[in-house]
């Protein structure tokens, strides 16, 4: 197979879209460079004194890891200077990040989780960067505003993630299928390794943190019992796999099928909708899932149809093989009837 780089792949698909501009390619190229810089630090984390926390707490009420802070800094610095974005939103920042007026502002908005699963770094488990790209809604002559960022998922121009593990992978979609690229350290390029990725219609793996069983409602318990029992449509139990790193769990689901679930629970009164953020986690992964032939819902609604009301809004997530997600939807609907 010819060794196709990310840039070559983008330029090829750009020719198929008359509305495409070089600005988007520039944005992706700067994201790729950021990924290489972050990947280098992740692989050397134990040698660079970047393990552990900073002692600070972010806007989510979570302890900030040193690598979280580093990845966030890298992405903001690089993307501010790309000339392709006008604003950004990060899981680590309370408010939107406007590109300074002294720098060129582009037409795009970038939303990202700089290092999902960063608490796993200390034990050498996969982590990842999740990103979502939108077009600004306001005229270029106006100042960028919150409404440019608070858009439903179906408005995404592109979305993807970078998985840092035994190999570093970039998986993304521009609305023309899902493609995966693996970083070849010998040439310093992401090369196309997984073209036209698709999720099997039904899987054999379910992924959820079952230790929260006592905090779930009855429909959620029924759903989990369906997948772990033998009275399902497969006629035998699904296998349980749960890493606790969203990107790693979703990547496995994308490749092998099945379902990843993070339902609402009653552990934390201040987080009744669960832990995952709509804009920087659920929405971009839902975009990928649908492009790969899967589904993503919050229990009743299609994730991509949900319009965010706040920057760090949380939402339950059921994502993966279409028929497995259909079953979740069916059980919740029966309990609501």
UniProtKB/Swiss-Prot annotation:
Keywords: Carbohydrate metabolism, Cytoplasm, Hydrolase, Magnesium, Metal-binding. Its EC number is 3.1.3.11. GO terms for cellular component: cytosol. Mg(2+) 1 binds at residues 91, 113, 115. Pathway: Carbohydrate biosynthesis; gluconeogenesis. Gene3D superfamilies: 3.40.190.80, Fructose-1,6-Bisphosphatase, subunit A, domain 1 (3.30.540.10). Mg(2+) 2 binds at residues 113, 116, 281. The gene is fbp. This is Fructose-1,6-bisphosphatase class 1. Its main location: cytoplasm. One of its GO terms (biological process) is fructose 1,6-bisphosphate metabolic process. It is found in: Cytoplasm. Homotetramer.
């Amino acid at each position: 197979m010819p060794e196709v780089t990310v840039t070559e792949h983008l330029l090829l698909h750009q020719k198929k879209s008359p509305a495409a501009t070089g600005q988007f390619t520039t944005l992706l190229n700067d994201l790729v460079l950021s990924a290489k810089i972050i990947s280098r630090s992740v692989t050397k984390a134990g040698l660079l004194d970047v393990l552990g926390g900073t002692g600070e707490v972010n806007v989510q009420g979570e302890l900030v890891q040193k690598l979280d802070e580093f990845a966030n800094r890298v992405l903001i610095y690089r993307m501010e200077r790309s000339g392709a974005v006008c604003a950004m939103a990060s899981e680590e920042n309370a408010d939107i990040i406007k590109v300074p007026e002294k720098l060129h502002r582009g037409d795009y908005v970038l939303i990202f989780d700089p290092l999902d699963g960063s608490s796993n770094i200390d034990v050498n488990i996969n982590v990842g960067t999740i990103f979502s790209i939108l077009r600004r809604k306001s005229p270029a002559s106006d100042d960028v505003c919150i409404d440019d960022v608070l858009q439903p998922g179906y408005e995404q121009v592109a979305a993807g993630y970078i998985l840092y593990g035994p190999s570093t992978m970039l998986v993304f979609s521009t609305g023309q299928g899902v493609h995966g690229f693996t970083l070849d350290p010998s040439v310093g390029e992401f090369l196309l390794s997984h073209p036209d990725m698709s999720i099997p219609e039904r899987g054999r793996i379910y992924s959820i943190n079952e230790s929260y069983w006592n905090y779930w409602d009855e429909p959620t318990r029924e759903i989990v019992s369906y997948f772990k029992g033998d009275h399902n449509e497969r006629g035998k139990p699904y296998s349980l796999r749960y890493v606790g790193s969203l990107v790693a769990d979703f990547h496995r689901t994308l490749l092998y099928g099945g379902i990843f679930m993070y339902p609402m629970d009653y552990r934390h009164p201040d987080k009744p909708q669960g832990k995952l953020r709509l804009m920087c986690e659920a929405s971009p992964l839902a975009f990928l899932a649908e492009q790969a032939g899967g589904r993503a819902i919050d229990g009743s609604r299609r994730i991509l149809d949900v319009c965010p009301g706040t920057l760090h809004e949380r939402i339950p997530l059921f994502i993966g093989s279409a028929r497995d997600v259909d079953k979740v939807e069916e059980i919740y609907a029966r309990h609501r009837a």
